[in-house]
Amino acid sequence: MDDSRLFERTVSSAIQYSGPVFDVYSDTVELCNKKTARRDYLKHRGAVAVVPLTDNGGVIIERQFRYPQQRVMAEIPAGKLEAFDTDPLDAAKRELKEEIGVTAKEFIPLGIYIPPPAILSERIYVYLARGLSYGNAHPDEDEFLDYRETPLCQLID
């Protein structure tokens, strides 16, 4: 299948905001019909997410307040890629250890999740972690969370 007719060519690009987590861009693109359109989007370095599977088939879930949603949310451990990260697997190992104090013998890549692709450039590398060992968590100083093992069947319902 030839997708070349679907591509858009960047005519101009301007950063509207630059921050520590993402940048906001406003680009002008040329469409396949030679008309132009504006594309506003967030450029993000990327992230990792880890599904920590316990020996008895549960998953360790963390809960933390998410300001944009204005509520406490249950999530799998995750974090953004840092500038020094050359391999997402290294970031996955780091985030698992920092957030819930866990190391794993095995990391299995599950794929790449692309959240709203029309407005966000972020790619989230997702891993399954098995063979867990437990230690002390060291979350970032602005991270306040708790975590607990949740049976997999409760996550599917």
Language-model-derived ranges and their functions:
Residues 33, 54-56, 65, 130-134, ...:
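Short loop segments at secondary-structure junctions
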Residues 26-33, 116-135, 148:
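Active-site-adjacent beta-strand/loop module that shapes the phosphate/pyrophosphate-binding cleft
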Residues 12-15, 111-116:
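Short, solvent-exposed loop/turn elements at beta->coil junctions and helix N-caps
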Residues 2-14:
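A short, amphipathic edge element
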Residues 44-47, 139-157:
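NUDIX/MutT-family hydrolases
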Residues 5, 39, 49-94:
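Conserved Nudix-box catalytic region and its N-terminal flanking loop in Nudix hydrolases
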Residues 61, 76-109, 127, 141-142, ...:
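The catalytic Nudix box helix
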Residues 12-49, 55-56:
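Acidic, metal-coordinating catalytic segment for phosphate/diphosphate chemistry
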